[in-house]
Curated annotation (Swiss-Prot):
One of its GO terms (cellular component) is cytoplasm. Its main location: cytoplasm. Residues 342-419 form the OCT domain. Its EC number is 3.6.5.-. This is GTPase Obg. Residues 159-327 form the OBG-type G domain. Its cofactor is Mg(2+). InterPro entries: G_OBG, GTP-bd, GTP-bd_Obg/CgtA, GTP-bd_prot_GTP1/OBG_C_sf, GTP1-OBG_CS, GTP1_OBG_dom, GTP1_OBG_dom_sf, OBG_GTPase. It is found in: Cytoplasm. It comes from Syntrophomonas wolfei subsp. wolfei (strain DSM 2245B / Goettingen). Monomer. Residues 1-158 form the Obg domain. An essential GTPase which binds GTP, GDP and possibly (p)ppGpp with moderate affinity, with high nucleotide exchange rates and a fairly low GTP hydrolysis rate. Plays a role in control of the cell cycle, stress response, ribosome biogenesis and in those bacteria that undergo differentiation, in morphogenesis control.
Length: 419
């Protein structure tokens, strides 16, 4: 089964907790704090691997969680960092944020990597909080939670040349003749349900990769037929061959076929039509095909290359011309993805909503503070109070009409407001 889309959940490892410890050694009467920091949580990293051809593995496993960092120890010993989780994906995989659709990475090269979920930093041990005012702090930080998100993986094949045509135009027959690829061939539409790749060798022993992609129909740019399945894979090709049924065996007109194919590519992505292309009239072994090819050339005013994929007539010459076009084509084809433009504005530390009589406070900074605070320590609680006051939470709550004894909730931490 060829799987070219997947949706997976990734979570970076949580940071290890810092600890509270003091030196208790003979001959060290004033040992002081010695709690070590927690280790950093591991990242989730996707790695491009030429050995993989589909996203099939992600059909059965959808959750990937990296290990957390180790907790700190006494004697100022820091916790070990988590070992990064590396997940292999096929070369040509595009990684997108599932919620926003933003392209996070496009893995085009063997071994190329992308960090998709960062591990949290380790919490600081009490030794970090020692100061002239507080020489023996009895609190530490918890580790920071790792980043987590759902992401989408889309595989776009890396081929030099793409075959564009209606179902039963003879694309599969052509690729089976010019390469060792053996796609399924039969006399009904959509025989090819998955892309096929073949390596072509010209008579001069030059090689290139040809993609036989599922047949196109009118309305494909809107997803009809195999629409988006087809169009996604054609985006990376550097040369396009329009394969047309000149014998009109399906009852369609060959000129109209070309115009529909051209229009579908234009509606999907006009840049596709800027690439080098050849118009190929197939099935020259069938009566009337030659006359239809002449009519096609006359009406379009463009050169039409006549072949028979069944008998091999004209195929060798076509592959030579295709390679010549490929040599002149740009080496890199843009992905077609819209650039993401961000306008950076000052981020508010929190926002306040009143829900069922409870003042709910949310925001990345203040939620991170809650998660990393050890509320079992009086000093840790006092540090939390000082920090939120500096952030302006107390004044903001008063502006929202909070009164003595009202409840405040930040993530899972709930407390009563007192002045």
């Amino acid at each position: 089964m060829f799987v070219d889309q997947a949706r997976i959940f990734v979570k970076g490892g949580d940071g290890g907790n810092g600890i509270v410890a003091f030196r208790r050694e003979k001959y060290v009467p004033m040992g002081g704090p010695s709690g070590g920091d927690g280790g950093r949580g591991a990242n989730v990293i996707l790695v491009a691997d030429e050995g993989l051809k589909t996203l099939m593995d992600f059909k059965y496993r959808r959750h990937f969680k990296a290990e957390r960092g180790a907790h700190g120890q006494g004697k100022n010993m820091h916790g070990a960092w988590g070992q990064d989780l590396r997940v292999k994906v096929p070369v040509g995989t595009v990684i997108k944020d599932d919620e926003s659709g933003e392209v996070l990475a496009d893995l085009l090269l063997q071994g190329q990597e992308a960090v998709v979920a960062k591990g949290g930093r380790g919490g600081r041990g009490n030794a970090r909080f020692s100061s002239a005012i507080n020489k023996a702090p009895s609190f530490s930080e918890n580790g920071e939670p790792g980043e987590e998100k759902w992401i989408r993986l889309e595989l776009k094949l890396l081929a030099d040349v793409g075959l564009v045509g209606f179902p039963n135009a003879g694309k599969s027959t052509l690729i089976s003749r010019v390469s060792a690829a053996r796609p399924k061939i039969a006399d009904y539409p959509f025989t090819t349900l998955v892309p096929n790749l073949g390596v072509v060798m010209t008579k001069e022993r030059d090689t290139f990769v040809l993609a036989d992609i599922p047949g196109l129909i009118e309305g494909a740019h809107q997803g009809l037929g195999l629409g988006h399945e087809f169009l996604r894979h054609i985006e990376r090709t550097r040369v396009i061959l329009f394969i047309l049924d000149a014998a009109q065996t399906e009852g369609r007109d060959v000129v109209e076929d070309y115009r529909i194919l051209y229009r579908e590519l234009e509606l999907h992505n006009p840049d596709l039509l800027k690439r080098p292309q050849l118009i190929v009239a197939n099935k020259m072994d069938i009566p009337d095909a030659r006359d239809n090819a002449r009519r096609l050339e006359s009406e379009l005013g463009k050169t039409v290359h006549c072949i028979s994929a069944v008998t091999g007539q004209g195929v060798e010459e076509l592959m030579g011309k295709t390679y010549a076009l490929l040599q002149a084509a740009p080496q890199e084809i843009p992905s077609g993805e819209e650039p993401v433009v961000r306008r950076f504005e000052e981020e508010l530390p929190f926002k306040i909503d009143k829900v069922d009589g409870v003042f709910e406070v949310s925001g990345p900074r203040i939620e991170k503070l809650v998660v990393m605070t050890n509320f079992n320590s009086d000093e840790g609680l006092q540090r939390f109070q000082r920090t939120v006051i500096k952030m302006g939470l107390e004044e903001a709550l008063k502006e929202h009409g909070i009164k003595e004894g009202d409840s405040v909730r930040i993530k899972d931490f709930e407390f009563e407001f007192t002045e």
